[in-house]
A protein has these predicted regions:
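A short, solvent-exposed beta-edge/loop patch
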Residues: 78, 96-142
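Juxtamembrane extracytoplasmic segments of single-/few-pass membrane proteins
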Residues: 1-73, 77-80
Length: 142
């Protein structure tokens, strides 16, 4: 008999990483010149509001099919390249590891009030400043 992998063995990091690789050809070099208003129209569903985006260049924002339901998918221009952000509802049954990497990309997961925030960027990208910038500007209504 084949060993069955249970769904609970999947990690949030693995799903997010696969999503970044899967979408990369579609959003590479795309700049939708995203406004704060557009971001907040999408974030509202997750109970979050971004209070400002000074110093942040957001090139893409949308809902995406993430594991068992929707998540927010946003791409921010980092120092070394694009940094992908996912806001994933907390009820999504995936194991959480605070950091993960595969040699090309690395990621961090921050459990926030209303959702888990996943950030993924280049191995050389410093994700902590991006995380702090976002976390300090996110306001939760839930």
């Amino acid at each position: 008999s084949w060993p069955l992998t249970t769904q609970s063995e999947l990690s949030l990091g693995q799903v997010a990483m696969a999503h970044v690789y899967g979408e990369e050809p579609f959003i590479k070099d795309v700049d939708e010149k995203v406004s704060l208003r557009t971001i907040n129209a999408k974030m509202e569903k997750y109970g979050a509001t971004l209070m400002g985006m000074d110093g942040m260049k957001v090139t893409y924002v949308n809902h995406c099919a993430f594991y068992q339901g929707p998540a927010l998918h946003m791409v921010i221009q980092g120092k070394m390249g694009p940094v992908t952000l996912f806001l994933v509802p907390k009820h999504v049954p995936l194991t959480i590891q605070p950091d993960f990497a595969d040699g090309t990309l690395k990621g961090e997961i921050l459990p926030l009030k209303g959702a888990n925030m996943v950030l993924i960027g280049d191995m050389q990208e410093s994700l902590a400043p991006v995380a702090q910038q976002l976390e300090s500007r996110l306001h939760w209504s839930i």
